[in-house]
Design a protein with these regions (language model features):
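Structural preference for beta-rich elements and adjacent junctions enriched in aromatics
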Residues: 1-274, 283
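Transmembrane beta-strands of outer-membrane beta-barrel pores
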Residues: 14, 56, 79, 121-127, ...
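Outer-membrane beta-barrel translocator/channel fold
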Residues: 21-24, 160-197, 286-301, 316-372, ...
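Membrane-embedded beta-strand positions of outer-membrane beta-barrel proteins
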Residues: 52, 119, 140, 152, ...
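Short loop/turn motifs that connect adjacent beta-strands in outer-membrane beta-barrel proteins
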Residues: 59-69, 107-114, 147, 247, ...
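Exposed, low-structure sequence patches enriched in small/polar residues
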Residues: 234, 318-458
Length: 458
């Protein structure tokens, strides 16, 4: 839509393998999205070319009156043999201002609709128990061509989805897994409210269809309940509807899990609204999770801002609030990025998550009860004299301090890294870190008998 709200990337290699991604908040990349498009390449004697077919309905777009519409665009070629890229605009996806720097492009305006239906029927039979399972359902994707889009999944079957990588995690921090189910990756960028480095996600769609709620002590056949615990829940229904207007975007998401013999499915709801001002975006997201088995519910509210009105400065912030039966939590994250040119960048940030903040019923929170200050400097150079051996240099220094909300300070830290890329395709990575002494409450899980471990200087 040309308002630097979200960008979509389409990539094809010489072997015709495809990749796509979305970019928000400057250059926050997500590879979860899987668009409906195709591309092919042709290799000649001393050249190769590529051709992309991107349907007009591949992404939701605002309705525009008139014969022309404005978009932002970049064409990029990566020469893997030389590890070198060529772009139609002087920017790339590693820069914090990537989608703000794209060139305006005026194209013919079209309006088209696309309605897609994917019914399914599966039959499974166990030859030992002679049990037979039949399932039928349908996925519906409706692009109305006026900036609104509706996705519906009735009794969906996610059995064909690729499995996650095996992760052995003994830490107190939950491993975050990205979404792979097409229904939840399609048309989802409006609902993405997240912190940097996976600090938090207000909506983590992997919770939907997750492990059911159990309390086997409620049942006389508790041993049968224990032996039949499932790691996932089937879905009865999922619905998402989004509307894109000139000044505001709106979205609604709902999902309902199936009941089973020893549990009842949960219900999930989310409502999203966001302004479309190119220089000052303000959004609000509300979620509700209802546990029908425990007869409990949880609510989360978030307010997010993204401001680029001040020259060379990007300001982003989030206010978080969670409410459960007996607790209310609060959170704040704030970042200021100063980018005077393509060689230097400075980020100053702060976040505060109190001990009662809980996003994990429908979202993801890496850890609560934490205060963090950080400052990051980046020094890049992408051009050197012809006689120089170097092609580029990327350097950054990070300074940080974390503590619990009651003042237990973790070690202060300094981390620096430099990446040197030579014209001979030889690369050198140099890194160094140093920490002061401090208290680590993460290792002991804040056990009352040993609330922290004293960490010495490193």
């Amino acid at each position: 839509d040309g308002n630097s709200k979200v960008a979509y990337g389409f990539t094809v290699s010489l072997g015709d393998s495809l990749a796509d991604a979305t970019y928000t908040n400057g250059n926050s990349e997500s590879k979860d999205w899987d668009g409906d498009w195709i591309a092919r390449t042709f290799k000649g004697n001393n050249f190769w070319s590529s051709e992309f077919f991107i349907p007009w309905t591949v992404v939701p777009m605002q309705k525009v009156d008139g014969p022309k519409r404005n978009v932002k665009f970049i064409a990029f070629r990566w020469l893997a043999s030389d590890e070198f890229g060529f772009g139609s605009t002087k920017t790339n996806w590693e820069r914090e201002t990537f989608i703000y720097d794209l060139e305006d492009l005026v194209i013919d305006n079209y309006q088209s609709k696309k309605y897609s239906y994917f019914p399914y029927l599966t039959v499974a039979e166990d030859s030992v128990t002679n049990e037979s399972i039949q399932k039928a359902g349908i996925d519906i994707f409706l692009n109305h061509g006026d900036g609104s889009q509706t996705n519906i999944a009735i009794n969906p079957d996610f059995g064909q989805v690729e499995t996650d990588q095996v992760v052995v995690n003994f830490s107190a921090i939950e491993t975050f897994f990205s979404e792979k189910r097409a229904f939840f990756t399609e048309n989802h960028s409006l609902f993405e409210v997240k912190g940097g480095r996976d600090d938090f996600y207000v909506i983590n769609t992997r919770r939907i269809g997750g492990r059911p709620d159990y309390d086997c002590s409620r049942f006389e056949q508790s041993d049968i309940c224990e032996n039949n615990r499932k790691e996932y829940s089937d879905l009865d229904l999922a619905l998402r509807h989004t509307i894109q207007k000139e000044k505001v975007d709106l979205g609604f998401l709902a999902a309902s899990e199936s009941d089973e013999n020893f549990s009842k499915g949960r219900d999930y709801f989310a409502f999203r609204v966001r302004s479309n001002s190119p220089q000052n975006k303000v959004g609000f997201l509300a979620t509700k999770t209802k546990s029908n088995f425990f007869n409990e519910s949880s609510d989360v509210y978030s307010l997010d801002i993204e401001n680029t009105a001040v020259k060379n400065t990007q300001i982003s912030g989030y206010l978080l609030n969670s409410r459960k039966e007996n607790s209310t939590g609060h959170g704040l994250r704030f970042d200021i990025k100063y980018i005077p040119n393509d060689k230097y960048e400075n980020t100053v940030g702060f976040h505060y998550f109190d001990k009662d903040l809980d996003l994990n019923d429908m979202g993801y929170l890496q850890r609560n009860d934490q205060i963090k200050f950080y400052n990051r400097f980046e020094f890049d150079r992408n051009s050197y004299p012809k006689e120089s051996l170097l092609r580029s240099r990327d350097s950054h220094i990070s300074i940080f301090q974390t503590m619990t909300t009651d003042g237990k300070k973790s070690p202060k830290g300094v981390w620096t890294k430099t990446e040197l890329s030579f014209k001979s395709n030889f690369n050198i990575d140099l890194s160094m870190s140093a920490k002061t002494e401090g208290k680590d409450t993460n290792i002991t899980r804040k056990y009352i008998g040993s609330p922290y471990i004293q960490i010495m200087d490193e």
